[in-house]
Amino acid sequence: MKIGNYQLKNNLIVAPMAGVTDRPFRELCLRYGAGMAVSEMMSCNPALWKTAKSQNRMVHEGESGIRSVQIAGSDPQLMAEAAQFSVENGAQIIDINMGCPAKKVNKKLAGSALLRYPDVIEDILKAVVNAVNVPVTLKTRTGWDTDNKNCLSIAQLAEDCGIQALALHGRTRACMYKGEAEYDSIKAVKAAVSIPVIANGDIDSPEKARYVLEYTGADALMIGRPAQGRPWIFQEIQHFLEHGTTMPELPISEVKDIMLGHVTALHQFYGEYLGPRIARKHVSWYLQEHEQASAFRRTFNAIETADQQLDALEGYFDNVAS
């Protein structure tokens, strides 16, 4: 699959997730089979660009793979400036967020709140596309609610404005993440536009991945929450798509190595104070299917230093293996 002049190594993409798809997580997913990883969203408000959080989101020097940076906001001029700033800091693709359902984003008329204002969407898309010389993509939902599904017209508008790929989550904003994603809307959008369409929502297994690709005709898949605590899901899906067989479960020794490497990378990236705190949620995701881990997770969440976290994980896996 290509986005503009960029050839992805496969059609599996890591979805942008605030507080999750930082550089350590993106690098890990790329190592375990993802074809591209989209960064956490960056606000178009220039007053926030110099904050520690935004600075961490802009670290791209030496990063593996294609560097896709997501921006969020509702002001066309500020969105254009955010796109330019991102490109100056290493972005090779700009992704526009019109899919985030979070209240704190929507109350600023950003994310999926924009689906109620097609005229504003058009202004934003044109402004961003005209502001940069890299491909611009769009991530969105099927509509504001079930009575106001407008993804088909938004997709056609996006293509007309020069958007070079469209990721569509199979839920409305009102659905948040409740219920099941639907794929009929994605199928209809794929039939209506000529730009690449990326299916998103509840793609949590190799079998589901193949079904969604075949049912919708989508060019690629975008995977978010199912990769939390299971970044190797991308290689599992790719293996199944290529060979029609499922990979054996990773041995516990490899899961241990992945976790320890990820936690160490978080410590190094965020530092001694913030690193251990961010590591807690990732460890919880890794261990969510370990029946014996509930007590350990509570203990781990109280640990405040990097060395103690690593020692605790070593001890946990020693007990699991014994």
Swiss-Prot record:
PROSITE patterns: UPF0034
Family of this protein: Belongs to the Dus family. DusB subfamily.
EC number: 1.3.1.-
Name of the molecule in the record: tRNA-dihydrouridine synthase B
A molecular-function term among this protein's GO annotations: tRNA dihydrouridine synthase activity
Binding site for FMN: 16-18, 70, 139, 200-202, 224-225
Keywords assigned: Flavoprotein, FMN, NADP, Oxidoreductase, RNA-binding, tRNA processing, tRNA-binding
Catalytic machinery residues: 100
Membrane-spanning ranges: none
Its job: Catalyzes the synthesis of 5,6-dihydrouridine (D), a modified base found in the D-loop of most tRNAs, via the reduction of the C5-C6 double bond in target uridines.
Catalytic activity: a 5,6-dihydrouridine in tRNA + NAD(+) = a uridine in tRNA + NADH + H(+); a 5,6-dihydrouridine in tRNA + NADP(+) = a uridine in tRNA + NADPH + H(+)
Listed cofactors: FMN
Source organism of this protein record: Vibrio cholerae serotype O1 (strain ATCC 39315 / El Tor Inaba N16961)
Enzyme class, UniProt record, top EC level: oxidoreductase
